Swiss-Prot record:
Cellular compartments annotated: Cytoplasm
MF terms in GO: rRNA (uridine-2'-O-)-methyltransferase activity
Provenance organism: Photobacterium profundum (strain SS9)
Enzyme class: transferase
E.C. designation(s): 2.1.1.166
Name of protein: Ribosomal RNA large subunit methyltransferase E
PANTHER family: RIBOSOMAL RNA METHYLTRANSFERASE, RRNA METHYLTRANSFERASE 2, MITOCHONDRIAL
Catalyzed chemical reaction(s): uridine(2552) in 23S rRNA + S-adenosyl-L-methionine = 2'-O-methyluridine(2552) in 23S rRNA + S-adenosyl-L-homocysteine + H(+)
Length: 209
């Protein structure tokens, strides 16, 4: 891509970003990102989060989902967040920076969780997209498979899982796998999710050990 095309594309993105009503509302309410409205809508419909719960948030930076989850679970609950990117501290959130695909990071994450089991696993993870669907989709599916593996390790019986998934190759098989593991599975496309995006959220409740 030429520099001029990149510049024009970046300019369009910035204009869209700052004109976005969800960006403006997030700033007004003191939230870190527009992504908060996705988990807020999921919460209103599916009631995943409750006071006193333990929540794991994967791909947490810049912290919108963790910020919202911490408000809901309150002082009696806890939110354990992990991301390869750095994240400023948040009240009620224990943050671990690192790639949980690495054994040392995974062990550190599990240490923060144990001996308790987790009530909810959240994942808003996505790879850096290149625009090449043939390479982007497998990388995205790899991340959601890792999130599901985390559920198998830490999720309590009847626990819940909400994960961002991009529709495409591997989606149907992944959905079938989740249906085998949970009693109730729904697909959500929050209003704040951009129409052109292939992202949807699989919301699963009633984890079956």
């Amino acid at each position: 891509m030429s520099r001029n095309k990149q510049s024009a594309s970046s300019g369009r993105w910035l204009k869209e970003h700052f004109d976005d009503k969800y960006v403006q509302e997030a700033q007004k309410r003191g939230y870190r990102s527009r992504a908060i409205f996705k988990i807020e809508e999921i919460q209103k419909k599916d009631k995943l989060l409750k006071p006193g719960m333990t929540v794991v948030d994967l791909g947490a930076a810049p912290g919108g989902w963790s910020q919202y989850a911490a408000e809901v679970v309150g002082d009696e609950g806890q939110v354990i967040a992990c991301d390869i990117l750095s994240m400023d501290s948040l009240p009620g959130v224990s943050f671990l920076q690192g790639d949980f695909r690495e054994e040392a990071v995974l062990s550190a994450l599990l240490e923060r969780i144990q001996p308790d089991m987790v009530d909810v696993v959240l994942s808003d993870m996505a790879p850096n997209m290149s625009g090449n669907l043939a390479s982007d989709q497998p990388r995205a599916m790899y991340l959601v498979e890792l999130a599901l593996e985390m559920c198998k390790q830490v999720l309590a019986p009847n626990g819940s899982f909400a994960v961002k998934v991009f529709q495409g190759e591997g989606f149907d098989q992944y959905l079938a796998e989740i249906r085998n593991m949970f009693k109730v599975v729904k697909i959500r496309k929050p209003d704040s999710s951009r129409d052109r995006s292939r992202e949807v959220y699989i919301v699963a409740t009633g984890y079956k050990l």
